[in-house]
Amino acid sequence: MFDGIGFMELLLIGVLGLVVLGPERLPVAVRSVTGWIRAMKRMANSVKEELEQELKIEQLHADLKKAESKGLSNLSPELQESIDQLKQAAQSVNRPYQVQDIPAQENQIHNPASQSVSSEASPTASSAPTSEPNQGEDTRSNPKANG
């Protein structure tokens, strides 16, 4: 893990850490440093894997272009079928989003409750009981009536 660092150098770093941080904070510092090292290793491995995957994809594209340049008629039927499937998949990815034609009735939101209520059965403002204000007294102008 530590290329170029010998046992004596590690011992010296440990003693200096013990002197500077003390016995209480040294284990916490070592744990945090090892956590950072693990995170950096994970990040480096993920970048490495992504690059390898991209290189494989590029190699496959190069092989496909090479096969196309040689002529697709010389290929075996299995390879021809797989190339056709790849082309269909590429066309489906490259095609823009297409809206299917749906009749207008299917696009409407149906509300069965509003369809079952007829105009005769629906409550109107004229059939609702009305409450009339007290006639004779104006409560806005009479402060004694308000309080």
Curated annotation (Swiss-Prot):
<keyword id="KW-1133">Transmembrane helix</keyword>
<keyword id="KW-0472">Membrane</keyword>
<keyword id="KW-0811">Translocation</keyword>
<keyword id="KW-1003">Cell membrane</keyword>
<dbReference type="Pfam" id="PF02416">
    <property type="entry name" value="TatA_B_E"/>
</dbReference>
<dbReference type="InterPro" id="IPR003369">
    <property type="entry name" value="TatA/B/E"/>
</dbReference>
<comment type="similarity">
    <text>Belongs to the TatB family.</text>
</comment>
<dbReference type="GO" id="GO:0033281">
    <property type="term" value="C:TAT protein transport complex"/>
</dbReference>
<keyword id="KW-0653">Protein transport</keyword>
<comment type="subunit">
    <text>The Tat system comprises two distinct complexes: a TatABC complex, containing multiple copies of TatA, TatB and TatC subunits, and a separate TatA complex, containing only TatA subunits. Substrates initially bind to the TatABC complex, which probably triggers association of the separate TatA complex to form the active translocon.</text>
</comment>
<feature type="compositionally biased region" description="Low complexity">
    <location>
        <begin position="112"/>
        <end position="133"/>
    </location>
</feature>
<keyword id="KW-0997">Cell inner membrane</keyword>
<feature type="compositionally biased region" description="Polar residues">
    <location>
        <begin position="71"/>
        <end position="97"/>
    </location>
</feature>
<feature type="region of interest" description="Disordered">
    <location>
        <begin position="68"/>
        <end position="147"/>
    </location>
</feature>
<dbReference type="GO" id="GO:0043953">
    <property type="term" value="P:protein transport by the Tat complex"/>
</dbReference>
<protein>
    <recommendedName>
        <fullName>Sec-independent protein translocase protein TatB</fullName>
    </recommendedName>
</protein>
<dbReference type="InterPro" id="IPR018448">
    <property type="entry name" value="TatB"/>
</dbReference>
<comment type="function">
    <text>Part of the twin-arginine translocation (Tat) system that transports large folded proteins containing a characteristic twin-arginine motif in their signal peptide across membranes. Together with TatC, TatB is part of a receptor directly interacting with Tat signal peptides. TatB may form an oligomeric binding site that transiently accommodates folded Tat precursor proteins before their translocation.</text>
</comment>
<dbReference type="GO" id="GO:0008320">
    <property type="term" value="F:protein transmembrane transporter activity"/>
</dbReference>
<feature type="transmembrane region" description="Helical">
    <location>
        <begin position="2"/>
        <end position="22"/>
    </location>
</feature>
<keyword id="KW-0812">Transmembrane</keyword>
<keyword id="KW-0813">Transport</keyword>
